[in-house]
Each structure stands twice: as C-alpha cells, then as structure tokens.
Curated annotation (Swiss-Prot):
GO cellular component: cytosol; plasma membrane
Taxonomic placement: Bacteria, Pseudomonadati, Pseudomonadota, Gammaproteobacteria, Vibrionales
Keyword Nucleotide-binding tagged: yes
Gene Ontology molecular-function annotations: GTP binding; GTPase activity; ribosomal small subunit binding; small ribosomal subunit rRNA binding
Protein name (database record): GTPase Era
Length: 320
C-alpha cells in the first residue's frame, strides 16, 4: 500500500463502526421526582461518570442538566431536573419548579423516581402532573437496597403501580446501579428514528465553566451546615486555560446572604474554605483532565435568591 493511501479497514478497527444517519435513533428522557430522591445519582450512574452534583440535602440540583448517552445508532438525551416541590416561597424555588416543569415537554419517555419506602405530598404533586400528560412513564422505585424486607418493597410497588398506567414499575438502586440495564431497554424501545443531536463524544450540554461552579457548590453543601444550601450560590468570574502551565486558572465567587453565613463558609482560621477549595480542585482536575489553579472568595449579597435580576445574571433564568 502506498504511504498516502487511506486504509479504511485500519480506520474502522481503531474507531469502531460509524453510525449512519439513516439508522440513527435519538430522543429525550426526563428524570423527574421530588427533591432528594436520587435523580442526579441515577443520571451519573447511567452515563458512567459524574456530570450532576449530589448531596444528601434536598434541592441540590438547581438547573436543568442534559446528559448524553450514545451507543452506536442510539443516542439517549437524559434531562436531570430540579426536584418538584410544593413550597414556592422564594424566587429561586419558583424558578426551580418552572425549570423542572419545562423539562416535561417534547420528551419520549419519563423516569418517575420515588423512594422505595414511603410516598409524600411532593410525590403526589409530580404524579398529578404526569397524569395530565400523554408521556409514557416508567416508575422507578429507588433505594430498594435500603430496605431489608423484600415483601415490604413488593407491597409498596404494588400500591404505587395502581396510581397510573405505567409502562413498567422497576425497583432500582441508583447508587448501586441495580436494574439500570432494564431502564436502558425501555429507553431503546422509546427512541424514535432521528439524527443524533450531539457528537458521539459529548456527555453533557453544560460547559466546563458551569461544571466548575457546580463542583464548588457541591463541596459547600458537603462541608457546611443545613442552613446554607438555600442561601449560597457560586459565580465563576474567571475560567482560563494557560498553555504555559497547561492548566485551568479558575476564580470562584461564593455568594451568601448574611455575614454569619460568610463566617460559616470561611471557618475558623480559614480552614473550611481551604477544605472546600482543595476538594473542589481535586474533582475539577479529575473531570477536566488537567491541572487546576483555583481561587475562592466569599461575598455577602443580601436577598440574591429573591432577586430575579440577580438570578438571571447567575444563569437561573436561562433554564426556562
């Protein structure tokens, strides 16, 4: 073979079979449920990597995040939504509900996540919205690994299955990955023939800048008390790649509403903010695959969570 001749067999051997547009399937799957039921954990497990932050605290997810899973001819675009909840006392809560509701449009399948042990008023609210829609819904009964009595889970599932004509009722553990393969089969069955929306290597529609802000916010929730999650946000003021250091230089501004919260974030002798910064930097380096130089500041901005102008500048309105 001449040096400049293209070896098509070698190309396919190294790159795998290229999906042709006429054989492609593509569609959207909304992951919905009340706050803190495991939606982001499920998305991360399906994708095999972390794109949506998690914590034990409710309403960790504030934005609508898309995760892209491409397998040959099939591309599934998952939409992780903020938890739908009844209380809408603050502007940020109203916007989170609106972002979650707007995700329930033009989807091909819905995963409705509920807890494997109990049913709440917020679950009932989500169910009511789904009953009014025409979308096929798979009821995903999560956290079954936390229940010792198998009969208890089966009885709970039987009761919930009567609430709506579900495509299927699947017991899962988002954390352990139990029955993820069953969910994938349902996804394939509901993806229409359509050209892929994203290149094969894409995993999310969100930018690295956005992911950096979310990682810092996750560490804030992990290392601070229960009061902070609803009163803190993160704005990335600088996100630059420096070829000399072959790394990202990132400045993160942490906004809180009161001086007491600022002291809580900084900690005694600045120890807490150092821990938050260190842990965030390590996660960013793993995600971005490069060295990260992260600097963090804390600033008091009273009432930001009730100010729609401030929320718009911080990117919350863009989800609608």
């Amino acid at each position: 073979m001449a040096d400049n001749e293209f070896d098509i067999d070698a190309f396919f051997a190294s790159h795998g079979e290229v999906s042709s547009p006429e054989n492609q399937h593509c569609g959207f799957i909304a992951i919905v449920g009340r706050p803190n039921v495991g939606k982001s954990t499920l998305l991360n497990k399906i994708l095999g990597q972390k794109i949506s932050i998690t914590s034990r605290k409710p309403q960790t997810t504030r934005h609508r995040i898309m995760g892209v899973d491409t397998d040959g001819d099939y591309q599934a675009i998952y939409v992780d939504t903020p938890g739908l909840h009844i209380e809408e006392k603050r502007a940020i809560n109203r916007l989170m509900n609106r972002a979650a509701n707007s995700s329930l449009s033009d989807v091909n399948l819905v995963f409705f996540l509920v807890d494997g042990t109990h049913w709440t008023k917020d679950d009932e609210m989500v169910l009511t919205k789904l009953q009014k829609s025409n979308f096929p819904v798979v009821l995903c009964v999560n956290k079954v690994d936390n229940v010792q009595d198998r009969n208890e889970v089966m009885l709970h599932m039987a009761e919930m299955s009567k609430k709506m004509d579900f495509v299927d009722v699947v017991p899962i553990s988002a954390k352990q990955g139990k029955n993820i393969d069953v969910l994938r089969k349902h996804v394939r069955n509901h993806l229409p023939k359509a050209t892929h929306h994203f290149p094969e290597e894409y995993v999310t529609d969100r930018s690295q800048r956005f992911m950096a802000s979310e990682i810092v916010r996750e560490k804030l929730m992990r290392f601070t008390g229960d009061e902070l999650p609803y009163s803190v946000t993160v704005e990335i003021e600088r996100f630059d790649y420096n070829p000399e250091t072959d790394g990202f230089h990132i400045n993160a501004l942490i906004l809180v509403e009161r001086n007491g919260q600022k002291k809580m974030v900084i900690g005694k002798g600045g120890e807490k903010i150092k821990t938050i910064g260190r842990e965030a930097r390590l996660d960013m380096e793993e995600l971005f695959g490069r060295k990260v130089y992260l600097e963090t500041w804390v600033k008091v901005k009273s009432g930001w969570a009730d100010d729609e102008r401030a929320l718009r500048s911080l990117g919350y309105i863009d989800d609608l």
